[in-house]
Amino acid sequence: MENKKTKIISIASIIALALTLVTATFAYFMAQTGEGKSTDIKINANTVDTFTFETGSALNLSLNQENFASGKGNQTGTTFAKAMLTANNKTNTATEHYYLYLSISENTFTYTQDANTPEILLSIKDASNNEITTLTGLTYKTVTDGKGASIKGFDITTKSGLITILNNREITTTSSKTEQWNVTVTFVNYNSNQAGNAGKNFTAKLMIQKEKITLLADWVISQYTGTQGDNALYYHNSTLTNGAGDNSYRYAGGDYVLTDAGKATGATMMIGYNNTVTTALIDFYCNGTKQYVGYRCSSSQTHYYLIKGDTTQYQTYNEALSASVEKGYLTKDNVKNFVCFGTDASPCPTENLYRIIGVFNNQVKLVKWDYAKSSLLGTDGDFSQEYSYYFSGEQGESPSSNSMYYWNNAGTNTWSESNLNKINLNTNFVNNIGTIWAKKIATTTWKVGGGTWSNIGTSVPKTAYQYEVGSNASTTTYEAKIGLMYVTDYYYSASPSAWTLVGYNESDATKDYRFSKGENWLYGGGFDWTISRDSGSSNRAFFVDERSYVRSYYVYNYDYFYGVRPSFSLLSSTAYVSGAGSMSDPVRIN
């Protein structure tokens, strides 16, 4: 009887302890809805501090014929965010911290008067009408509108992405406390000629939460240690030898690196640039004849790969690479710039793997890792055919089957007229990737004037960059979400030792990008269209050959159809969530 009593008391004690642990847990809820609904959770427990958040509706400005005219007045949008803290009744005190952000997902407005005359102003006030007048990176201004009224706020006329309003703000109470922040965005009507903003849109929401947001661009930049090349990242400032000089952060180098054990086999390079090279670690054979990785073999012919000193015939490039790693001849994952985009599935499907080219003006630029299939880009527009040759340098899902597209089958090398651009990339891709993911992509002003063969194809990267997108570039641009890589994106993705090479040297492969094939993570192994036209003609554009050099060919014709790897920039507000950046552990974003 005594034993039963003891057991009952013990069970009761365990239950009581469990309840104590549960109710002593700190409770808060992260609010990011921006939909005008309360998102707080209240837990009725004597020993709990409750910390909750609430946000108002999204902010929207859209100028149309009804509201955009002389005398119509300013256009405004208003919302709020609340942080609510209640202390437990045991200690009667509570202290917490929170962050408040304005996330601008769309802003197409521009300056119509001059850069000192703001068109959109941001005002932030607390519940007592006290205004915030200092924010890092923003300028607080006072202007007079068309009706003579004074309008104050931060100039956000062309701003996009994430704006930090409150950074780790402390909130303390001995009972309960609510901090409310009222936010207003105002389009200022000056009764001047502001026609440049007709039809423009602005969309944003407040985000209030306990955790600090790490922007993807900041995460990438944080991988740069100050030493060029650490983590395969290079800061292209004015002192980087042979660099772009545009203050971008770019990944460069090969995914695999030859080890001392690999060199001990007699290899001096991972893969060769032609079939006469005898010091490549991995060789490719087509129909029994030695060729080189990058050689295109008919699907009807036999093929295999050999590793130096190994007679095993490997059937795919990936098999040969994996075996080389297992033998200790290569190290892998040298460039950790993989991103999973278009899905939250785990593991990330090959079709959804993208790679970070770099950070440009606080925006992260991606390119698809594998060649896009017609299931993503469609069989309309500038689609040509499914191509069944075996590309020996491809690592994707199907090296023997690629969806091929013309750059512009209409025959001209004007990007704005290309159906690859208008239909396959900026209609089909955008629709097929899904609304949620498409909204994460920024509208980019692409430089599409291209350059001459001598300025881009037979020049070193630093010179080519200036003519393609730099100070000597054409003023021809095109605004769209999706594009293709620039030629110089490809050049600068190779190891710095390649930055003295040219895109193509007819007489010596050791002096062009064939020589750096194994040291360039952006080398895809197939045909790659770039977005840049050959401005020396009316019907040619630049592409990367399967052998890794850069050429210029016709944008149409049955024999000139190539693979496509879509490229785009993410909104600067895109947040880093997790991932090391390897293929098996790609970066996840929000």
Question: What would you call each of these model-derived segments?
Answer:
Residues E2-G73, G196-I213:
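Short, polar/proline-rich extracytoplasmic segments that appear immediately after membrane translocation
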Residues S38-D40, K82, T203-K205, Y304, ...:
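Well-ordered beta-strand positions in beta-sheet-rich domains
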